[in-house]
Amino acid sequence: MANLLDKTRKITSILQRSVDSLEGDLPYNNMAAQLADIIDCNAAIVNGGGALLGFAMKYKTNNDRVEKFFKAKQLPEEYIRGISRVYDTQENIGIDSDLTIFPVELKDDFPDGLTTIAPIYGGGMRLGSFIIWRNDHDFVDDDLILVEIASTVVGLQLLHLQTENLEETIRKQTAINMAINTLSYSEIKAVSAILNELDGLEGRLTASVIADRIGITRSVIVNALRKLESAGIIESRSLGMKGTYLKVLNEGIYDKLKEYE
């Protein structure tokens, strides 16, 4: 019991860590590694679309074909369809099941391989799946208790991250709307011309050249840039005789400008 309690505390302590660490292509790699160590297994966290958010391989169980899926950070579509129909934790799935994560061509190498799949829920929604597997040894009751706790912890983290992303999207859209509402028709025309001039999201431009081409004064462009910069939509830097360096910080401005075309 003491060992189970200690492991439970280790899992719940993950919630106390900042979600700022959940960055990069595989934001849940560290979490998967911690859970794999605690439960003593391989572990993978996938979202509802099958994208791999993080994984940890304590034990070698894959071949080159399956390694490619992990490197691509996307599990096979047919496998994701299968696990999406797992609504409650299914433990100790054998090597012959379609739900096993072991490669079919390695059945003879891992005849006792076992997979456990736990759905991840958050806010009443299915957010993904927590998959763990071993070369042998059943997942016993203590392991399954930890799996249930782990899937809940991951679900809370996923939901929190989704909420933060939504709040950031709303903040950015609000900034764009407020900035656009301060622009005159000529300034909106100038902003469209400026952004079309960029190579991607940043680049160098000459305000006077753009002004002459679209038939407005240079001051209109300067005022438009100043308003966008104060709203945090762009950043600019004078390059002297070479013009102005411009970088777009809020990409939503492109979609907003389409409404005025």
Curated annotation (Swiss-Prot):
Pfam families attached to this UniProt entry: CodY, HTH_CodY
Main location: cytoplasm
GO terms (BP aspect): negative regulation of DNA-templated transcription
CC annotations in GO: cytoplasm
DNA-binding region positions on the chain: 207-226
Top-level taxon in the UniProt lineage: Bacteria
InterPro entries: ArsR-like_HTH (IPR011991), CodY (IPR014154), GAF-like_dom_sf (IPR029016), GTP_trans_reg_CodY_C (IPR013198), Transc_reg_CodY_N (IPR010312), WH-like_DNA-bd_sf (IPR036388), WH_DNA-bd_sf (IPR036390)
GAF domain as annotated region, ranges: 1-159
Keywords for the protein's UniProt record, in alphabetical order: Cytoplasm, DNA-binding, Repressor, Transcription, Transcription regulation
The keyword Transmembrane helix is annotated on this UniProt entry: no
GO molecular function: DNA binding; DNA-binding transcription factor activity; GTP binding
Subcellular location field: Cytoplasm
Cited HAMAP family: HTH_type_CodY
Homology family: Belongs to the CodY family.
PANTHER family (alphabetical): GLOBAL TRANSCRIPTIONAL REGULATOR CODY (PTHR40062:SF1), GTP-SENSING TRANSCRIPTIONAL PLEIOTROPIC REPRESSOR CODY (PTHR40062)
Summary of the function given for this chain in its UniProt record: DNA-binding global transcriptional regulator which is involved in the adaptive response to starvation and acts by directly or indirectly controlling the expression of numerous genes in response to nutrient availability. During rapid exponential growth, CodY is highly active and represses genes whose products allow adaptation to nutrient depletion.
The protein, known as: Global transcriptional regulator CodY
Species the sequence originates in: Streptococcus thermophilus (strain ATCC BAA-250 / LMG 18311)
